[in-house]
Amino acid sequence: MKKRLALLMALVMVFSLCCFSAPAAFADGKTVINVMSFTDEVPNMINRFVETHPDFADKYEINTTIIATTDGLYQPALDQALASGGADAPDLYCAEAAFILKYAQGDMAEYAAAYEDLGIDVAAEIEAAQIAPYSVEIGTRPSDGKVVGLGYQATGGAFIYRRSIAKDVFGSDDPAVVAEAIGAGTQSWDKFFEAAAALKEKGYAIVSGDGDIWHAIENSSDQGWIVDGKLNIDPKREAFLDLSKQLKDNGYHNDTQDWTEAWYADMAGIGDQPVFGFYGPAWLINYVMAGNSGGSAPGEGTYGDWAVCPSNVGFFWGGTWLLANKDTTKAEAVAEIIKWITLDATEDGLQYGWANGTWSGEQGTKDTVASGAVMAVSNGELDFLGGQNMFEAFVPANEYANGSNLTQYDETINNYWRDAVRQYTAGELSRDDAINAFKTNVADNLDVEVDF
């Protein structure tokens, strides 16, 4: 899910993690569990599990392969590893929102083990932990109705804004005031653009680039890219063409692209125009914005000058699901790991420590997690947000998270669409030509029926 780690993972690939090393490489007699991921997030969680479960550590060794999603490298490598099978195949693997359906419901779903076949009482565990319904929905295989994957985060989105700019333009940094200004809950962009005009008058950009509204649009659409085997352009996604052009033509953003240095610079307030806000889940704050704010304590850079309010459109963005190989010979051990990360709602589980910031390292930042039972007893106050409890905004936002608009081709098709939109807003293509170029890319590169 988190492209913030793309560069790091590209560097990691230089080392031996690029491919599976043979289980025989471990000479201590332990059983090897192969793990495959696209960032170090889940591997770090598993390492923590091993550290806190000495009996498990006495019997098992974790062999990790990390391949970044950069340049589309992860999925082909995972597909080959699953199809090839054998001792080097992953016992446990990860998939993010952009391609989870491929592995839980699509072309590669046959390789996933049902959680119940691993010995997990999945229905009872889900009920006890109050797991977010969309996480279960996305991880359920249609062919047999069985859960084959669960996430550990809840990724409902909100609007994250600069307090100082809110005071200057709207007279208050109160989340209720800003929510009203951007039209929170209206499922419309009308008030947002009224706010953009007011911000522009005082020299501010409302967002950094069109990508900042894309994720809200993409994940609030009613239908996905594929309907009944044919390419489908949901009206809300088609409207992105016009909304993006409106942003650019009026100078309402800095025309950056997400996951670039210019985008990060706007988080620190050092871009072309000071940027008012970003759309995203809690993980965007913890793992992207905080580290790019130009400081590490209130008063440094923009650190502490942020707050969160409900979004004008309900959406979610991201998430990672854990799946097990149906052919694993270590089902009991794999089940222990999966349960601790995705289903354990006790104070000893990953999710409680993560939600409350009691772990060290990356999982030491507070985050919204999939367990409603954990969220009910967790505190989301952050210095980065001026002491605001972010859970007050993010927990209600999770009601908008669902898997109904996801497809197994999202990562690829999203890239085609956003490229076409940028060509249109730059004046390189007409609106109709941009849509046709997008359709041509899909038709030429994917096994999807396209109407022109």
Please provide the spans of the model-predicted regions.
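Short helices/loops that flank or line small-molecule/ion binding pockets
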Residues: 75-89, 105-106, 166, 193-199, ...
